[in-house]
Amino acid sequence: MSSSRSGYIREINGPILRIHLPGGRNGEQVRIGSLDIVGEIIALEGDDAIIQAYESTEGLRPGESVSGLGHPLTVELGPGLLQGIFDGVQRPLAEIAGLAGDNIPRGLHIDSLDRTREWPFEPAEALQPGAEIRSGTRLGTVQETETIEHRILVPPDIGGELIDLAPAGDYLLDATIARVRDPQGTVHKLKLFHRWPVRRPRPYKQRDHGVEPLIT
């Protein structure tokens, strides 16, 4: 998608709004009003778009600005996800409580996964520079808890020649742990986490079906 663009609110009906935003795309994430309320385009009508707001629209009025962010609504996948408690747009509730108490302020934007924590990364022993890797290849592991081993995989849609792989050590989520050159020559920097559009199904090699019910 293109970079961010600006528009304005035409109509408001609860969490559903009509906005004027030329060039909007279905599924695009938007920020609404001065509070930057989170929303998503759910339909297009010419240069207008219908959006759903994921926070209260109380106090908004026609004419207020809307920004299309140029990318779909996404989530972050990586170490820390399995230990976290999040709201519906993957905002970490524990961090929000520490900042704002029990009530979630509208328009509050916090990284879903902690950018200040270091994670113990163990690279896959079988991988060496020059190896051909593809989506789903295990780059290494992070021992997220005593019982949970988080496998760091090559994200979907990326594959090619492994240029280098980070040695064992503690890394921030934003640190580059591997570089991959795809067949077109583009170099991709892979981190301990990646973002994924919420409306796009995750690919899988096979699906294992349960044979026993979970008794609670």
Task: Give the residues covered by each predicted segment.
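Short, compositionally biased
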Residues: 43-49, 79-90, 148-169, 187-204
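P-loop NTPase nucleotide-binding/switch module
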Residues: 98-123, 127-156, 172-216
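N-terminal accessory targeting/assembly segments
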Residues: 1-105
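Compositionally biased, intrinsically disordered low-complexity regions
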Residues: 9, 16, 142, 161-162, ...
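Residue "hotspots" at secondary-structure boundaries inside conserved domains
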Residues: 22, 58, 73, 125, ...
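Short alpha-helix capping/helix-loop boundary micro-motifs
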Residues: 15-19, 49-55, 117-128, 161-166
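Generic structural hydrophobic/aromatic packing signal, biased to beta-strands
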Residues: 19, 30, 41, 51, ...
